[in-house]
Every structure is written in structure tokens, then in C-alpha cells.
């Protein structure tokens, strides 16, 4: 209920230490957290909870600190051994060849807890031009992983001063059915093994397979 809503900082004061069955999240991508960044690194559970590291404070553009890297690690940490999650992330996350992004992907693959990735069309959010992908985590999936490139789907529409891409119900259904069935569709999706992903330097981009 509304009385149970509390404003706080999940990263430095986790009010839900119990493990979760399911998590759905659209975390902030970039945010200046330089004032409390060192507090994160001093948390007693930091090595387990933030296994891939805590972003450094840059000399400039502190407002572009990649706070999503903290949230996705927190989500992985918060899942039960058979838990599942869906997380909206900047598409750059799925191909970054170094740093925390790659370390997170490597953790997901090496520990076999990945269901798949759907790369969405540009401007799927009207208020930002950042391309996004949806990362699906499944701690019990030891089989193939499905990677979908949905970037060419959708229709461009104007929303106020901004342009937005809108998926039709049929396109949404195509994504859902392809993902659930783990289908390989030419120029749209691939199914890959964890070993395949390792050979591609842990890339989660369908276009690289």
C-alpha cells in the first residue's frame, strides 16, 4: 500500500536483504553518485554484491557515472538460486570489451545464469536517444541462450517534440514467441551456447553470431 512506500537508497541501504524469485527493473543509466561512491566500496558485502567492481569517479562529467552497473550487480546478488530477472540496460552493455560491463557479462556466462537479450529499436523511449536492450537473467538456465535483434522493428511516431518508436502488437508477439521458443530466425535471432558466447569474447549481440 501507499503507506509502505519509502524513499531511500537501495545501493547503500538495502531494505530487502531477503532473496527474490523475480525482479523487473529499469534502473537509471547515468547519475552522479560521487558523494557516496566510497561508501559503496566500504560495505561489508561489497566483494560478493558488487563482484565486478564499483565505477570510479571521473575527473569530469560526473553526471555520466554508470550507476546501472551497480544496479545490475545488486539484482544478480538479490536473486534466489533459481531466480529470474529482466533488466533494461543501455545497449552498449552487451558488447563492451572491457571494464565492469564485460566483467558482469562474463559472470553471467561463466556461472550459467543467462536466458537471453533483446536489443530494442532506437527511440523506444521518447525522452532519450539511448539505445536499450533487455537483459534476461535466469539462474537455472544451463541450456542455450537466445539473442534477439529487434532494432529494425517498430514505427516512428512523434510524441510532443520527440520521436518515438512504437511496436505493433504483432511485433511484440513475434519477440515474445521467438524468445520463449528459442527460435533462430534469419536477420532477427540466434540461439547460442555458453561456449559460443565465450568464443565471441562474451558479446551478447545477435549480430555478432
Place the predicted regions along the sequence by residue.
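S-adenosyl-L-methionine
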Residues: 1-17
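A conserved structural/catalytic subdomain of Rossmann-like adenosyl-cofactor enzymes
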Residues: 13-209
